Structures are given as C-alpha cells and as structure tokens.
Amino acid sequence: MKTKTYLQQLVTSLKVNKFYLLPYLIVWLMGLLVVLLYDKIDIHQFTNQRPCGIGDSLFPYITKLGETFPFIVGGILLLFHLRKALFVLSVQVVGAIVVYTLKNLFRARRPRIVFQELGLDLHTIDGVRLHAWNSFPSGHTMTAFAFFLSLALIVKNKLLKFFFFAMSLLVGFSRIY
C-alpha cells in the first residue's frame, strides 16, 4: 500500500471540503471588496448603528467562541483522538502566533478610540469590555475561523461543515457588531 504524500493529502482534503472552502473563499473575497471600496469607519458605523435586542443578547456569547473555547475543545479531543486534537491545536497555535505578530506590527487602534476621537457615537453592549489597541487583525475572528475550519476539515458531514462555516461568520460579525 502506497502512502500519500503531504501534497496529495492536501489536494484530496481540498476536494473533499470544497463545500466549506468555496463559500469561505466567496465571503472572504466579498469582504475584501467591501474593505477596498469603503472606508473602515463607514463600514463599522454602518454595522454598529443598527443594533437589535437579539444581537445585544447573543453576540457577547458568540464572540466568546473566539476565545478559549477552541482550545478547550482541542484539549477534550486530545483525550479521544490524538491526531485530530493535535491538528486542531496546531492550527490554533500557528494562528495565534500570526495574529500576535501582526497585531504588534500594525498596532491599530480599536473603534472605541477612533470613534471617540472623531466625536462619533459607538453602540456598546453592557458587560462587554472594549480595549484600546491592537484591533487588527481580530484574534477572536482568526481563532474562530481557524477552529471551525480545522473542524470542517475533520468531519465528513456536509451539514456540520456548513454549521462550522456559519459559526465562524457569526463570530467574525460579532466583533464589529
């Protein structure tokens, strides 16, 4: 029996996961287009100035999926599926290193500071602590996307893949809500 090379495994994984990766690529390209066409402040203000009670209630919990939750799940997987757990945890660690490096490189101010300096109102949610620096890239969003992507690559169920895609989008949106 011939062992597949890493490149062959990657190509196979990309083919098998096209139902997750294609929508992700489309959303990423749409987001890139919006960022290229519109000012960052206008985008944030458009999103932020349309609060709703459900969003105010749910997004503080959804955003937590981009914190320690992925590492806890990775640790639990470690108890039962060593290879899968190591994959999930390694994706998280690599992502965290990349985000930490980029945050320190860009040192972007967070919307709270920018809006305050411009005299603009910023809708906030009670109980959610707002920081001042290192806004870009979003660690929560990266953690969630990396986590849900790694899970989508592991599972075979297409409905679960779609669920993971939707959850990663919700966490990302919760960061600008």
Identify what each model region corresponds to:
Residues F19-Y20, G74-T101:
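Interfacial segments of alpha-helical transmembrane regions
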Residues G31-L36, T63-H81, H140-F145, L151-I154, F173-I176:
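Hydrophobic alpha-helical transmembrane segments
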Residues G31-V35, V93-T101, A166-Y177:
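Aromatic-anchored segments of alpha-helical transmembrane domains
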